[in-house]
């Protein structure tokens, strides 16, 4: 396995607004090692979501490269980028984006079925993940029947269902009250550590950020290491 599972090399991203060009990322470099949890702590509007979208191959940079598990992705066709993303990267967002017509276990099965697992295999793994997330008694409930914290734990289980190498999370506890946020982060941390994933987690919560292996921020379009707390 490469020494890094995710690397951004001199990544640029800008947006044109009328006659103005807004620079979001400028020669941004970042490396995520296997098994580490990194907090991305920065104010709103500084480019956290853009960085995560580029790192997760959801958005193309204007310059530089993203390397996933040793594979440079600059210049790859979109179908190849999608293949890498589905195999290597899981996503968790502030809002769960669960499919409302499906049960918890069906939501966790979905990415596995897309990846080619049989329904029986997908159901077994989904059940194991939900049990690990302490949702074993809630597998047949639809999202509307679950609390906000339960919904987010289902979303975390779904994100790791295909055993990715990298988990990218954009304010995963941002829509929750402090107590529930703590429970959800504990579940997220437990499954990341248990699975040996590498995780980059954007958060405003300094207390949660301090529990990760290191913290970075965005400054003038670049990724900057923050001192340990």
From Swiss-Prot:
Enzyme Commission code(s) on record: 7.6.2.-
Keywords per UniProt: ATP-binding, Cell inner membrane, Cell membrane, Membrane, Nucleotide-binding, Translocase, Transport
Annotated ranges, domain ABC transporter: 6-226
GO biological-process terms attached to the record: lipoprotein localization to outer membrane; protein localization to outer membrane
One of the record's GO cellular component terms: plasma membrane
InterPro entries: AAA+_ATPase, ABC_transporter-like_ATP-bd, ABC_transporter-like_CS, ABC_transpr_LolD-like, MacB-like_ATP-bd, P-loop_NTPase
GO-annotated molecular function: ATP binding; ATP hydrolysis activity; transmembrane transporter activity
UniProt main location, coarse: membrane
Family recorded in the similarity comment: Belongs to the ABC transporter superfamily. Lipoprotein translocase (TC 3.A.1.125) family.
Annotated function: Part of the ABC transporter complex LolCDE involved in the translocation of mature outer membrane-directed lipoproteins, from the inner membrane to the periplasmic chaperone, LolA. Responsible for the formation of the LolA-lipoprotein complex in an ATP-dependent manner.
Subunit: The complex is composed of two ATP-binding proteins (LolD) and two transmembrane proteins (LolC and LolE).
Protein name: Lipoprotein-releasing system ATP-binding protein LolD
Organism: Chelativorans sp. (strain BNC1)
Lineage: Bacteria, Pseudomonadati, Pseudomonadota, Alphaproteobacteria, Hyphomicrobiales
């Amino acid at each position: 396995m490469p020494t890094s599972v995710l690397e951004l090399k001199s990544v640029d991203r800008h947006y044109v607004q009328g006659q103005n060009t807004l620079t979001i990322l400028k020669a941004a470099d970042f490396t995520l090692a296997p098994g580490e949890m990194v907090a991305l702590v920065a104010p709103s509007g500084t480019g956290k979501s853009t960085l995560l979208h580029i790192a997760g191959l959801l958005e193309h940079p204007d310059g530089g490269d993203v390397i996933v598990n040793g594979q440079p992705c600059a210049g790859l066709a979109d179908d190849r980028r999608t293949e890498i993303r589905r195999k290597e990267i899981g996503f968790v967002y502030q809002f769960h984006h669960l499919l409302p017509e499906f049960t918890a276990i069906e939501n966790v099965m979905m990415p596995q079925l897309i990846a080619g697992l049989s329904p029986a295999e997908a159901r077994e793994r989904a059940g194991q993940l939900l049990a690990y997330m302490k949702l074993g008694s809630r597998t047949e409930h639809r999202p509307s029947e679950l609390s906000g914290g339960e919904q987010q734990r289902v979303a975390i289980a779904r994100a790791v269902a295909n055993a990715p190498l990298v988990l990218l999370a954009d304010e995963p506890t941002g829509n929750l009250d402090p107590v529930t946020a703590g429970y959800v982060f504990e579940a997220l941390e437990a499954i990341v550590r248990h699975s040996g994933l590498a995780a980059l987690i954007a958060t405003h919560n300094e207390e949660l950020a301090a529990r990760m292996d290191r913290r970075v921020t965005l400054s003038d379009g670049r990724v900057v290491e923050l001192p340990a707390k």
